[in-house]
Protein backbone atom coordinates (compact mmCIF):
# COMPACT_ATOMS: atom_id res chain seq x y z
CA UNK A 1 0.00 0.00 0.00
CA UNK A 2 1.07 3.54 -0.75
CA UNK A 3 0.16 6.53 1.38
CA UNK A 4 -0.12 10.07 0.02
CA UNK A 5 -1.17 13.42 1.43
CA UNK A 6 -3.06 15.49 -1.11
CA UNK A 7 -3.51 19.23 -0.54
CA UNK A 8 -7.11 20.26 -1.23
CA UNK A 9 -8.49 23.81 -1.28
CA UNK A 10 -12.10 24.73 -0.56
CA UNK A 11 -12.97 22.23 2.18
CA UNK A 12 -14.48 23.85 5.26
CA UNK A 13 -17.14 21.63 6.84
CA UNK A 14 -18.36 18.09 7.48
CA UNK A 15 -20.17 18.04 4.14
CA UNK A 16 -16.85 18.78 2.43
CA UNK A 17 -15.13 16.03 4.41
CA UNK A 18 -17.82 13.49 3.54
CA UNK A 19 -17.87 14.44 -0.15
CA UNK A 20 -14.12 14.03 -0.59
CA UNK A 21 -13.80 10.87 1.51
CA UNK A 22 -16.76 9.23 -0.24
CA UNK A 23 -15.51 10.13 -3.73
CA UNK A 24 -12.10 8.62 -3.00
CA UNK A 25 -13.53 5.54 -1.27
CA UNK A 26 -15.46 4.69 -4.47
CA UNK A 27 -12.23 4.34 -6.44
CA UNK A 28 -11.01 0.79 -6.92
CA UNK A 29 -7.69 0.55 -5.12
CA UNK A 30 -8.29 3.16 -2.40
CA UNK A 31 -8.36 1.48 1.00
CA UNK A 32 -8.79 4.62 3.14
CA UNK A 33 -9.19 8.38 2.84
CA UNK A 34 -9.12 10.73 5.81
CA UNK A 35 -9.68 14.48 5.45
CA UNK A 36 -8.02 16.93 7.83
CA UNK A 37 -10.00 20.18 7.57
CA UNK A 38 -7.52 22.16 9.70
CA UNK A 39 -4.60 21.22 7.44
CA UNK A 40 -6.59 21.33 4.16
CA UNK A 41 -5.48 17.90 3.05
CA UNK A 42 -6.60 14.32 2.68
CA UNK A 43 -4.44 11.34 3.60
CA UNK A 44 -5.07 8.47 1.19
CA UNK A 45 -3.91 4.88 1.44
CA UNK A 46 -4.11 3.09 -1.89
CA UNK A 47 -2.76 0.40 -4.17
CA UNK A 48 -0.76 2.25 -6.82
CA UNK A 49 -1.14 -0.61 -9.28
CA UNK A 50 -4.93 -0.05 -9.30
CA UNK A 51 -5.39 3.71 -8.92
CA UNK A 52 -3.28 6.74 -9.87
CA UNK A 53 -2.87 10.20 -8.42
CA UNK A 54 -4.69 11.54 -11.49
CA UNK A 55 -7.69 9.28 -10.74
CA UNK A 56 -7.81 10.62 -7.18
CA UNK A 57 -7.34 14.22 -8.32
CA UNK A 58 -10.25 13.90 -10.77
CA UNK A 59 -12.51 12.38 -8.10
CA UNK A 60 -11.78 15.29 -5.75
CA UNK A 61 -12.18 17.94 -8.45
CA UNK A 62 -15.52 16.42 -9.54
CA UNK A 63 -16.76 17.25 -6.03
CA UNK A 64 -15.89 20.92 -6.62
CA UNK A 65 -12.56 21.20 -4.78
CA UNK A 66 -9.13 22.21 -6.05
CA UNK A 67 -6.14 19.90 -5.71
CA UNK A 68 -2.82 21.70 -5.18
Swiss-Prot record:
- What's the short name of a Pfam family annotated to this entry? HMA
Main subcellular location = cytoplasm
Instruction: List, in alphabetical order, the Gene Ontology terms for molecular function in this entry.
Output: copper ion binding
Name one process (GO BP) from the record: copper ion transport
Q: Where is the signal peptide?
A: none
Cross-referenced InterPro entries, in alphabetical order?
Answer: CopZ, Cu-bd, Heavy-metal-associated_CS, HMA_Cu_ion-bd, HMA_dom, HMA_dom_sf
Q: What does this protein do?
A: Chaperone that serves for the intracellular sequestration and transport of Cu(+). Delivers Cu(+) to the copper-exporting P-type ATPase A (CopA).
Q: What is the protein name stated in its UniProt record?
A: Copper chaperone CopZ
Q: Organism source for this protein? A: Staphylococcus epidermidis (strain ATCC 35984 / DSM 28319 / BCRC 17069 / CCUG 31568 / BM 3577 / RP62A)
Amino acid sequence: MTQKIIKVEGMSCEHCRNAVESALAKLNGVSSAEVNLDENHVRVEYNDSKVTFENMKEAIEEQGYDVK
